[in-house]
Each structure stands twice: as structure tokens, then as C-alpha cells.
């Protein structure tokens, strides 16, 4: 079951018509992103940071909580066959990170999908997407993993919220420039 997600400024309910079909597909691909990435090659997940902070307005709106409410944040980098491909940021109210979403604190290098897709009590919102820009909470994290030099690349991200027992877990995933080359390449049988 999917539920609506409040649209914070800049997030779109559909991909712009100017995007190519490949980007549209990945921005709104249902199910676990990790499963899709594994179809392209060997996926490695590296935790970049985990910490408590106050929820930025953009993300607070996406979780239907007050801005600056205490939240727990987890940022990870997923690589495919050694190529940095996706930066993801997940957050939940701090209290929920000790309650219904405490599993996110124990994942280590496992993907969130390991705890999200096996519980029928979890519901996911619809996806929204946007081109990341300065001021979006994980823009700096994503841009730091993009190729250096030249103009800033177009970094497209998607996000959705998972709900369990009335508590949100907001997940945003940004596709790095190198990902699009991997996604375009024919996949060898495994």
C-alpha cells in the first residue's frame, strides 16, 4: 500500500518530461533500490555517517513533523562493481530510532531493504523526485562523490517515506553520474 507524501518545495510528483526514459524509470522504480542495483553488478554499501540532528524543514515536511525536531540520520554510499553509484540518506524521529525504527541503528553495512520489505505493517508513500541543489539536506554529501572539475553535474534524487506504527522513516536516494553509464550498459548474465 502506498500513501501520499507531502510535497516539500522542489520535490515533484512525476519526472519532468525532459528527462530520458532511463532516468524516469530509476527515479520511480518500485520496490527495493538495492535489488535493482544488484541486477547491474556486485553492490557494496558503505556507511558515511550516522548522527542525531534537528530535522531540516525540507525533510520535516516529508515526515509530517515540526522543523528542527530531533531525528536520527544515516547516510550511505552504494557502489556497483567498485563504481560509486548512489548516495542515500535516511532519517526518522530520534524517539522512533529507539522504538519502532531501532533496526536502522543496527544495520551496519546492510541496506535498509533488509528491514523494510519483510514486515506487512510497513507502508510506503509514493515517490517524489527532484534535481538536487544547494540547500537540499544531502546535496553536499552527493556532490562530494561526483566527479571533480567542470560544471556541477545534474544530480537527480528520489525519496519516499515508510510508515510503521504511525512513525515515519524518510529515505532519499541520489543517483551519481557514473550510475547512468552502468544502468545503460548491457547486463552480463550472472
Swiss-Prot record:
Subcellular location as annotated: Cytoplasm
E.C. code: 4.1.3.40
Any one GO cellular component localisation term in the record: cytosol
Entry GO MF terms: chorismate lyase activity
The keyword Cytoplasm is assigned to this record: yes
InterPro entries: Chorismate--pyruvate_lyase (IPR007440), Chorismate_lyase_/UTRA_dom_sf (IPR028978)
One BP term from GO: ubiquinone biosynthetic process
Superkingdom of origin: Bacteria
Entry keyword set: Cytoplasm, Lyase, Pyruvate, Ubiquinone biosynthesis
Residues bound to substrate: 74, 112, 173
Primary localization: cytoplasm
Catalytic reaction(s) noted: chorismate = 4-hydroxybenzoate + pyruvate
UniProt pathway: Cofactor biosynthesis; ubiquinone biosynthesis
HAMAP family per UniProt: UbiC
Family, similarity comment: Belongs to the UbiC family.
Function: Removes the pyruvyl group from chorismate, with concomitant aromatization of the ring, to provide 4-hydroxybenzoate (4HB) for the ubiquinone pathway.
Protein's name in the database: Probable chorismate pyruvate-lyase
Gene transcribed to yield this protein: ubiC
